[in-house]
From Swiss-Prot:
UniProt KW keywords: Cell membrane, Developmental protein, Differentiation, Disulfide bond, EGF-like domain, Endoplasmic reticulum, Glycoprotein, Golgi apparatus, Growth regulation, Membrane, Neurogenesis, Phosphoprotein, Proteoglycan, Secreted, Signal, Synapse, Transmembrane, Transmembrane helix
Protein name, as recorded: Chondroitin sulfate proteoglycan 5
Topological domain ranges for the Cytoplasmic compartment: 445-566
Biological role: May function as a growth and differentiation factor involved in neuritogenesis. May induce ERBB3 activation.
Highest classification ranks of the organism: Eukaryota, Metazoa, Chordata, Craniata, Vertebrata
Region of interest (Interaction with GOPC), residue spans: 442-460
GO CC annotation: cell surface; endoplasmic reticulum membrane; extracellular region; GABA-ergic synapse; glutamatergic synapse; Golgi apparatus; Golgi lumen; Golgi membrane
Residues recorded with modification Phosphoserine: S467, S475, S483, S543
Disulfide bridge positions per record: C374-C387, C381-C397, C399-C412
Organism this protein belongs to: Homo sapiens
């Protein structure tokens, strides 16, 4: 192969010459391509070619048109030698790692090659713009070192392309591919077309840069890594260890891992603040403990490998299962905190059970030991209350007592102030006074009604006429109305038929029939009535007086007799 050796050892092809070479390739019409060689040959080619670097003050004239006797596809090197497009492409491909292919050739639509990744990467079907080629030639990429050499590549029948009329000679071009992975194409992924012919399988590197697999065999490859890129059973090239990150993402290895949830292993702060909600959690804890073995019921698994997979399988070595929070609090061995059992439950007041995870009433498990609630939570009792531990009850709060201030509640959370007490006292006193006032008004009204009725009766009796008084059935004066009473002086005297004496007929008959000595008694009674006339005030006040002021003696006798007999 012809090389430009006119330059010094520290000088390389200028960018202008590379630009001219790219223009010649575009004008050539068809360029054959070969399969990618090994990385060792690419490295040797780069080492064999002179590394030219133009000095800062180097100035060159623009290349003029070729002479009439020279080849159209050749160009003049700085040393004066002619160099064809083959040498230009070889050196530019060795420096920049870019494959110069023609998309418009009849037998080649695009090349699909593996550049050190598990996914197929498509080479650009169209050549890049000249300014892009110029930028890539200025920045030489790092050539990875290959750890294994292979023989010279052999072309395939499908690689041969039709010759072009513009080129005077038909010599194949070597296309060098960078197996270490170059910078991604800024134009994005393009459509790939099947390559005519199969690429020769290239051996992969012996080093697998994966820290998540164990049990590799002596050759440095996993026995069952056929599904991963670069495994022995495939024709894909394995990525180089010193190259960039391969295109297949390492996140695929984490598909079998469960993300860590901190809430599954550590209780929240509400567990310490809202102790009033412990009963519901205690019921769940009781069901979990009383149901038997936790590992059998809830399938609590420790971090172990997959069942049935031994060393050398290339699978993840561990799998985490999230533990429910209700089992981590006081039921799983080694947990940080245990719930306080409900007071009075049988079997829960023991110092510790067989697994040593339960505590007595009023104690909780903290950092592997049972501690008192009063010591663990200094503010368990609110408003200055004192915390005590009572057997079979648990934590008990004794509320603080102050002047005109009282506290109540299980944890002294309620406050009663002096204002509230004053309101209650004043309200009670007002209620009692209201009841007394209502009773006083009620009885006063009753007395007033009685007094008013008596006054009306007195006024009515004062203005009554004598005729109304004589007709009154309750008046004793009706008997002695204006005539002598028909009262016999003696029992043997005949009766008179006077109608005025009918009222005394009954008494007359009684006296005369019952007692034979009745006449003598009647006489004595009449005498006594005359003597004691002044003592009968009631009879005198109720008896009518005659207009002349003279009362009949007989009437007085009758009245006296009537009073004594009755």
């Amino acid at each position: 192969m012809g090389r430009a050796g006119g330059g010094g050892p520290g000088r390389g092809p200028p960018p202008l010459l590379l630009f001219l070479g790219a223009a010649l390739v575009l004008a050539s019409g068809a360029v054959p391509a070969r399969e990618a060689g090994s990385a060792v040959e690419a490295e040797e080619l780069v080492k064999g070619s002179p590394a030219w670097e133009p000095p800062a003050n180097d100035t060159r004239e623009e290349a003029g048109p070729p002479a009439a006797g020279e080849d159209e596809a050749s160009w003049t090197a700085p040393g004066g030698e002619l160099a064809g497009p083959e040498e230009v492409l070889q050196e530019s491909a060795a420096v920049t790692g870019t494959a110069w292919l023609e998309a418009d050739s009849p037998g080649l639509g695009g090349v699909t090659a593996e550049a050190g990744s598990g996914d197929a990467q498509a080479l650009p079907a169209t050549l890049q713009a000249p300014h892009e080629v110029l930028g890539q030639s200025i920045m030489p990429p790092a050539i990875p070192e290959a750890t294994e050499a292979s023989g010279p590549p052999s072309p395939t029948p499908g690689d041969k392309l039709s010759p072009a009329s513009e080129l005077p000679k038909e010599s194949p071009l070597e296309v060098w591919l960078n197996l270490g992975g170059s910078t991604p194409d800024p134009q994005g992924p393009e459509l790939t077309y099947p390559f005519q012919g199969t690429l020769e399988p290239q051996p992969a590197s012996d080093i697998i840069d994966i820290d998540y697999f164990e049990g590799l065999d002596g050759e440095g490859r996993g026995a069952d890594l056929g599904s991963f890129p670069g495994s022995p059973g495939t024709s894909e090239n394995h990525p180089d260890t010193e190259g960039e990150t391969p295109s297949w993402s390492l996140l695929d290895l984490y598909d079998d891992f469960t993300p860590f949830d901190e809430s599954d292993f550590y209780p929240t702060t509400s567990f310490y603040d809202d102790l009033d909600e412990e009963e519901e959690e205690e019921e769940d804890d009781k069901d979990a403990v009383g149901g038997g073995d936790l590992e059998d019921e809830n399938e609590l698994l420790v971090p172990t490998g997959k069942p049935g997979l031994g060393p050398g399988t290339g699978q993840p070595t561990s799998r985490w299962h999230a533990v429910p929070p209700q089992h981590t609090l006081g039921s799983v061995p080694g947990s940080s905190i245990a719930l306080r059992p409900r007071p009075g439950e049988p079997g829960r007041d023991l110092a510790s059970s067989e697994n040593g995870t339960e505590c007595r009433s009023g104690f909780v498990r903290h950092n592997g030991s049972c501690r008192s609630v009063c010591d663990l939570f200094p503010s368990y009792c609110h408003n200055g209350g004192q915390c005590y531990l009572v057997e079979n009850i648990g934590a008990f709060c004794r509320c603080n007592t102050q002047d005109y201030i009282w506290h109540k509640g299980m944890r002294c959370e309620s406050i009663i102030t002096d204002f509230q007490v004053m309101c209650v006292a004043v309200g009670s006193a007002a209620l009692v006074l209201l009841l007394l006032f209502m009773m006083t008004v009620f009885f006063a009204k009753k007395l007033y009604l009685l007094k008013t009725e008596n006054t009306k009766l007195r006024r009515t009796n004062k203005f009554r006429t004598p005729s109304e008084l004589h007709n009154d059935n309750f008046s004793l004066s009706t008997i002695a109305e204006g005539s002598h009473p028909n009262v016999r002086k003696l029992c043997n005297t005949p009766r008179t038929s006077s109608p005025h004496a009918r009222a005394l007929a009954h008494y007359d008959n009684v006296i005369c029939q019952d007692d034979p000595s009745a006449p003598h008694k009647i006489q004595e009674v009449l005498k006594s009535c005359l003597k004691e006339e002044e003592s009968f005030n009631i009879q005198n006040s109720m008896s009518p007086k005659l207009e002349g002021g003279k009362g009949d003696q007989a009437d007085l006798d009758v009245n006296c007799l009537q009073n004594n007999l009755t």
